[in-house]
Regions:
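GST-like domain detector, emphasizing the conserved glutathione-binding G-site
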Residues: 1-122, 126-128
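Short alpha-helical "patches" and their helix-cap loops
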Residues: 31, 81, 112-116, 149-165
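Catalytic cores of nucleotide-enabled group-transfer and carboxylate-activating enzymes in metabolic
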Residues: 81, 123-126, 139-146, 169
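Amphipathic alpha-helical surface "interface" segments used
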Residues: 84-90, 137, 183-186
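Short, hydrophobic secondary-structure boundary micro-motifs
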Residues: 97, 154, 176-179
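Surface-exposed helix-capping loop/turn segments at secondary-structure junctions
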Residues: 127-134, 172-178
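GST superfamily/GST-like fold recognition
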Residues: 131-151, 157, 162
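Long hydrophobic alpha-helical segments typical of transmembrane helices together
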Residues: 159-186
Length: 186
């Protein structure tokens, strides 16, 4: 029997979220690493929106959302509070993260204003560090934010976030999650 297929891109925080769940549960997949400027035809056929991650199950079911992949492989049902945290991360924080990290993609954007706006989420996170599945759903985005200007990030008074992120990034599961694969060519 063939394995479910996971289309992924190593540096995408949504794909990291899905891969962390897959690694933690030992869920077996055929990993297909894609380059987003050269998306495979099969991936586009099963998921025309062209974003990663995409999980194709053996019965033909396609799961296109990272959180749904997490829920599927971990049999995880988010609590109301967890849903609120993920919602803030995926909407409010991600909105500002993109404009901070990629200001040239948007009209009339001050990346420092967006860094400050994104920082409000991190300040809240510093007061209530997520654990378990919720942690895996959020930390890839905080990693991306931190890595954009690591000196600035490290200079902020977010002791709990710094410790939590360091712990996430040094975990064996994260190291496995970040294994480098060659581009999958069909």
């Amino acid at each position: 029997m063939s394995l479910p297929i996971l289309y992924s891109f190593r540096r995408c925080p949504y794909a990291m979220r899905a891969r962390m769940a897959i690694v933690r549960t030992g869920f077996q997949v055929e990993h297909r690493e894609v380059v987003l400027r050269d998306r495979p035809a099969h991936m586009m056929e099963i998921s025309p929106k062209g974003t990663v991650p995409v999980l194709l199950l053996n019965d033909g079911t396609v799961i296109e959302e990272s959180l749904e992949i997490m829920e599927y492989v971990q049999s995880w049902e988010l609590t109301t509070e967890e849903r609120e945290w993920v919602g803030r991360n995926d909407n409010e924080f991600k909105f500002h993260l993109d404009r901070y990290k990629y200001p040239n993609r948007y009209d009339d954007v001050d990346h420092i204003e967006h860094r400050e706006a994104a920082s409000k989420f991190i300040q809240d996170l510093d007061k209530e560090i997520p654990i378990g599945n919720l942690s895996d759903a959020i930390f890839p985005f905080i990693r991306q934010f931190a890595n954009h200007d690591r000196d600035w990030f490290d200079s902020q008074n977010w002791n709990n976030v710094h410790s939590w992120l360091d712990e996430c990034l040094s975990s064996e599961e994260f190291k496995i999650c970040m294994t480098k694969y060659e581009q999958w060519i069909q």
